[in-house]
């Protein structure tokens, strides 16, 4: 019998939030190896294919098989408290044509393991410090560095997950040069957010409300941090719509990408904007990733999609 083993990682989950990349956990490759070892002990004659799949969280770049990688480099960035951290930038080989050849000169797909920059601390007190004092500016810095390495027709995929920092993504925008510069930059590029966590930024079940579970701050302080982050972020979202060169007449609404939307590397840069589209807001799907960076990057022109679906596509799970 032929068997496909395509597991994700196994990580500690205090308060239901995975501490991806932490010491006690198992990366997807290790999970696949353990499953294969146990399977072979019971059914040694089965043919096993191991295809570990990441979800866009910290360490996802390491799960991409070497034979799928055209180049790999490490970019230094700053964490929420300006600590030096390293993230992987991977350029993927183009997928072979039906004849088995690879097309020359076609646009490239890149993956930036940005979630490693804002990884959630295991210590609630350290997480509280990041929530109170942290910034997402380092994320903007590594995204800018990655975009400088990509071509104008390339797609840059950015892995994001839950974090303790909660500045609404303002640091990202500032590091990219401010609203006008960042909007112009992203309007000319294909930037996709690969979300390991689909939590919204605000709301009763949003990232702000969840700060009391993953940090040591009080509910009252978490509420104030969330109110401030959501308010500032939505001011930027509104201003970004005013700058949209495609807007005609009344200000149009930004499309909301959900877990069920078929948006990805092969889709157009912007979804159609019909009158029925919901308005992008702090309570929209996936906007809480990276401390609210997902919300602002989407307002600036990025698309978003569930991380496991994107990573499965990158490793050609459907063809395995």
Where would I find each of the regions flagged by the language model?
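N-terminal loops that bind phosphate or other acidic moieties
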Residues: 1-320
